[in-house]
Amino acid sequence: MSGLFITFEGPEGAGKTTVLQEIKNILTAEGLQVMATREPGGIDIAEQIREVILNENNILMDPKTEALLYAAARRQHLVEKVKPALEQGFIVLCDRFIDSSLAYQGYARGLGIDEVLSINEFAIGDMMPHVTVYFSIDPEEGLKRIYANGSREKNRLDLEKLDFHTKVQEGYQELMKRFPERFHSVDAGQSKDLVVQDVLKVIDEALKKIQL
């Protein structure tokens, strides 16, 4: 695997999706091969699963069903899009990956981080990210951003109460303790330009290590 797999994680409203696109543009302008993608989604089958997962009408969805659907979408996305790009030497920037399942379903939904990790290890094998950038923001501020952004696509997770999003944040904090070697936290409460600068520093360090 000759590429660099970087995932962007964080609670709702952290701004990672916007920053990811800007990072892609900057790295591409520098002459690097970059592919941006997202989860759940990124390819046709996974996008169809995304519609089921995030549909606001699916309020009866069981937490285990939710976790399994995410893992299924992740597997297809990985083998169809992410892995081929890495094999071609691309920098892959992915908006959410395994850690979202661990924080949301494993911790916030109460399924257990280890249990959800087991499901996802079956789905992705040893294809863990090289680097994970965590966008740190107060959950309440993140939700305010969501509802202030009229153009943002609202989904079922946005309808969860603040308590759920606080648990998601706690879940990510637990993951940073478990995987300190790949997690890098940036302050998402800053201006977008400062967040972009901080993320670029993380990526530059990763590029130096692998000399891509």
Curated annotation (Swiss-Prot):
Keyword Transferase: yes
Single GO cellular component term: cytosol
Gene Ontology molecular-function annotations: ATP binding; dTMP kinase activity
A Pfam entry, by short name: Thymidylate_kin
CDD domains tied to this protein: TMPK
Binding site for ATP: G10, P11, E12, G13, A14, G15, K16, T17
InterPro entries, A to Z: P-loop_NTPase, Thymidylate_kin-like_dom, Thymidylate_kin_CS, Thymidylate_kinase
A single BP term in Gene Ontology: dTTP biosynthetic process
PROSITE patterns: THYMIDYLATE_KINASE (PS01331)
Keywords, sorted A to Z: ATP-binding, Kinase, Nucleotide biosynthesis, Nucleotide-binding, Transferase
Keyword Kinase: yes
Catalytic activity field: dTMP + ATP = dTDP + ADP
Enzyme Commission numbers on file: 2.7.4.9
PANTHER family: THYMIDYLATE KINASE (PTHR10344), UMP-CMP KINASE 2, MITOCHONDRIAL (PTHR10344:SF4)
Its biological purpose: Phosphorylation of dTMP to form dTDP in both de novo and salvage pathways of dTTP synthesis.
Similarity annotation: Belongs to the thymidylate kinase family.
NCBIfam families documented for this protein: DTMP_kinase
Protein name: Thymidylate kinase
Protein source organism: Bacillus subtilis (strain 168)
